[in-house]
Amino acid sequence: MSKISYLQEREDMCKVAHYMWDRHLTNAAGGNFAVRVDEDRILISPSLMSERHFCELQPEDFLLINSNMDILEGTGKLSREGYMHVLLLTKFKNINATIHAHPMYCMVYVAQAKPIPNITEATMKRGPVECIPYTKAYTRNLHEEIYKYWEQRRELAETYPIGCIMPLHGVVVSGS
């Protein structure tokens, strides 16, 4: 294997992918995530991370991209949600990671397009996980709706992890 950049970050991302699967935070229907590793560098999980790999990834599986979504390292294909990850990671300087997933315990809310209320003191400061307007999956319109949701909560998003529900699809969360 040739030398790859950001090896420690990639190894950490392998653990996150494994945890996502093992803890039922996503399923074979999909899921993907990205981490900003430098000013104009983002590591992102490849397309079909869940469907083909069941989230068992190797460090070299992650793609290194720039803010134009050019693949700088890696041989895989970008996820259909790649633009959404890039949009949030480039427009919010305090957000360093984004995850799109299909968590088992959230999918009831997703299927009904219902917000997830706060139930613990620890989550009160973030507000509920609300729904964005229904938008067809894998489209720029969906990604723009997600960005609008974050923009409307900019101060909160720059301070705390937040998330939203994409009706009939899944969830998106961000954090530092």
Feature locations, PLM:
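Glycine-rich flexible loops
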Residues: M1-S176
